[in-house]
Swiss-Prot record:
Gene3D superfamilies found in the cross-reference section: 3.40.50.970
Protein's gene: menD
Function as written in the Swiss-Prot or TrEMBL entry: Catalyzes the thiamine diphosphate-dependent decarboxylation of 2-oxoglutarate and the subsequent addition of the resulting succinic semialdehyde-thiamine pyrophosphate anion to isochorismate to yield 2-succinyl-5-enolpyruvyl-6-hydroxy-3-cyclohexene-1-carboxylate (SEPHCHC).
Organism from which the protein derives: Rhodococcus jostii (strain RHA1)
Stated name of the protein: 2-succinyl-5-enolpyruvyl-6-hydroxy-3-cyclohexene-1-carboxylate synthase
Gene Ontology molecular function: 2-succinyl-5-enolpyruvyl-6-hydroxy-3-cyclohexene-1-carboxylic-acid synthase activity; magnesium ion binding; manganese ion binding; thiamine pyrophosphate binding
Biological process (GO), any one: menaquinone biosynthetic process
Cross-referenced CDD domains: TPP_PYR_MenD, TPP_SHCHC_synthase
Reaction catalysed by this enzyme: isochorismate + 2-oxoglutarate + H(+) = 5-enolpyruvoyl-6-hydroxy-2-succinyl-cyclohex-3-ene-1-carboxylate + CO2
Class of the enzyme per the UniProt entry, highest EC level: transferase
Cofactor(s) the protein requires to work: Mg(2+); Mn(2+); thiamine diphosphate
Family according to the record: Belongs to the TPP enzyme family. MenD subfamily.
Amino acid sequence: MNPSTAQATAVVDELVRGGVREVVLCPGSRNAPLAFALQAADLEGRLRLHMRIDERTAGFLALGLAVAGKRPVPIVMTSGTAVANLGPAVLEANYARVPLVVLSANRPYEMLGTGANQTIEQLGLFGSQVRATISLGLAEDDAGQNSQWRSAVCRVLAAARGTRSGNAGPVHFDIPLREPLVPDVHAQGPVPQGRPGGAAWTTTQHATLDVPMDLDLTPDTIVISGHGSALRPELAGLPTVAEPTAPLHGIPVHPMALPQLKPRQAVITGRPTLHRSVSKVLADPSVAVYALTTGPRWPDVSGNVLATGTRAVVSGEPDRAWINRCRTLSEHTDKAVRAQLAAHPKATGLHVAAAVMDALTDGDQLLLGASNPVRDAALVSYPAPKIRVLSNRGVAGIDGTVSAAVGAALAYEEGRTVALLGDLTFLHDASGLLIGSGEPRPRDLTIVVANDDGGGIFELLEQGDPQYAGVFERVFGTPHGMDLAALCAAYRVEHHLVGLGELSTRLSAPEAPGDRGIRVLEVTTERSGLRELHAAVRAQL
């Protein structure tokens, strides 16, 4: 067995021993030893391999697999620009704390700076965006290297999981490989062996960070539950503004009701980023703000946080009048939103979000586009407790959302996955629908596209003010006029153009026997009236 083949075999074996079950691979020559080893492990049923031809979408596929599967997922590619294409996925994984492993093949280091083909200084390419950058030395005919290879894999997985730091995230694992890059026809020599019984070479215990924080519940308190939050039993029963991807600790409070409530105290869990009404409360110097997190960072955009911890030690009792006021105002806001939706003459993204949220049932998995869809979902309904909700809210870009949805659906076998996206988000990553014949495909993924022919979110921002109407449509609205049906046909994906009523019917229909695969349900919406619709809701409050 030649050195590069031996090294790749040991690395893949140790990844499996370390708990890796899904791997995404992009074709290339320099990463051929890893490709051969991964294919062998896939055929043996030790892991599931996903082939993709585009490293950018492959990175987000791995991200979706990691988020939904709650395990590290390696994305393997050749050297050069192939590695650089992982930049957007690495950024998202960093800020969302997702255990993504970028496993890049490299040229031997002596080739750097020589003008050799497809050779760049890729070690350290991701800088501070990764938890660790780990490289292996060139493989030699030395049996003693086996322990170094396996030990390095264990370090990679520990860093990705945040085992010792409490801060999961992406890791760059760079492996320089020297020719020959294919297995010997007549392999000689032993296969590098791991620990007996399939154990990992190095085991690590997950470190726990326990920082108690005193919290008096007597002042009128609102909980702000943001993306990445853990469920906080000690906050049960408190009024909570929860983003769709975050747990609801207590009584749900509609985000549009918050300006009327005037809390005296706010407790942040996770990282809230969706609502301006929340940002205003957290920036109010008259509000005492506390932050509970599960890692070393805490959110504090305004610099207003008084104290942080990993758990609250509560004292005092919340005022029942405050609790009742929060409940009443929230229920009134919910009704106002639904009333305005019913009165609005045309379908908008809010209408589509309402139809989707109403059709979900226990066991469903929902993935929301990071632009308007996640905000629309937050305004029309809070997901039921037994619905899993995901969104790329680490950096909140629209990149790779189709691929992330495919990955999430592949990792979630317990039920169906529904993704709610805007048209620009869908078009930005339409190549995520490209799945090779024979590759694993989602069992049941429905992608709902609210198509308003452009960037609806800007209608609600300062740029959407009527005084900028002469500039808005071209540089912010960005109409495209794309035929989504033709696009889906090119990818051999089922497509239906539906109205709101048919959307609800199709989402609520009993599941047909067998695998449904991927389907796209497109709803034509309008964005020109979004500003007025939101204003009408606020007027009712």
